[in-house]
Amino acid sequence: MSAPCHCSAPKANIPALDDKYLSDDPAHPANLICELCRLFYDNNWVTGTGGGISIRDVKGENPNLVYIAPSGIQKERLQPWEMFVVDLNGEKLLRTPNECPQELTKSYKYKPSACTPLFMSCYTMREAGACIHTHSQSAVMCTLLWGDKVEFEISHIEQIKALPQLKLNESTSKIEKVGSMQYYDKLVIPIIENTPHEEDLTDSLQEAIRNYPGTTAVLVRRHGIYVWGEDVWKAKVYNEALDYLLELAVKMKTAGMDTVRK
């Protein structure tokens, strides 16, 4: 059974919801996820129901609320009421779209995103404000062109400046932003192996996050990429910059060029 589509329905035909987890504010996480999913769909990052996005309500009354797009939904048709909400403390499910009126759900049974444990890892280990998972073709191609290597590397490209320079503060054991990467810096992104089920990637993702304190992303071979940032707009910028660099790297590699200047 397919998920219901309300993308073209007049608002008057959609029942009003008395839901404390939703808002008319365009900057509310549930609304932003829908907006970004449409943008990402147009970029071929979340086609065929693939990929996902989650946002932590860092500017709301409870910054531990995490909004997550459901599994198996056409991302360009996503509606705010279709969000799952999870409490970061204890990872308790607070809201499910299955609680909405049947007028909306059409008896469709929504499932939480299979990315949920991976998103939670980014929030708990990096204090992220948003996490994006795409099936970017450039990301997949890079993991193939790099063979069995466990790191993607590129340097001396102007777009690297859009990414943060991070380091581990050993006294606090926290990752801190110390500025932006520079033109001559080398970007390193860990590559982990894919698994038959998304949630089975969790341990590998956590290990990569621990071993690469300077990264804001993890590539998954033959699958895609996870990107996070301190808020949703930073995560968006990082994702766009990384996809640019990955696409460029594919072209450089196929042209026989090194992606890292010797």
UniProtKB/Swiss-Prot annotation:
Catalysed reaction equations from the record: 5-(methylsulfanyl)-D-ribulose 1-phosphate = 5-methylsulfanyl-2,3-dioxopentyl phosphate + H2O
Enzyme nomenclature, EC number: 4.2.1.109
Residues the entry annotates as binding Zn(2+): 133, 135, 223
Main location class: cytoplasm
Catalytic site positions: 158
Cellular-component GO terms for this entry: cytoplasm
Gene Ontology terms describing biological process: L-methionine salvage from methylthioadenosine
Free-text function comment from the UniProt entry: Catalyzes the dehydration of methylthioribulose-1-phosphate (MTRu-1-P) into 2,3-diketo-5-methylthiopentyl-1-phosphate (DK-MTP-1-P).
Protein's recorded name: Methylthioribulose-1-phosphate dehydratase
Pathway: Amino-acid biosynthesis; L-methionine biosynthesis via salvage pathway; L-methionine from S-methyl-5-thio-alpha-D-ribose 1-phosphate: step 2/6
The organism's taxonomic lineage, starting at the top: Eukaryota, Fungi, Dikarya, Ascomycota, Saccharomycotina
Cofactor: Zn(2+)
Compartments where located: Cytoplasm
Cofactor note as given: Binds 1 zinc ion per subunit.
GO MF annotations in UniProt: methylthioribulose 1-phosphate dehydratase activity; zinc ion binding
Pfam hit, one: Aldolase_II
Top-tier EC class: lyase
Residues annotated as binding substrate: 115
Recorded family membership: Belongs to the aldolase class II family. MtnB subfamily.
The UniProt record lists the keyword Manganese: no
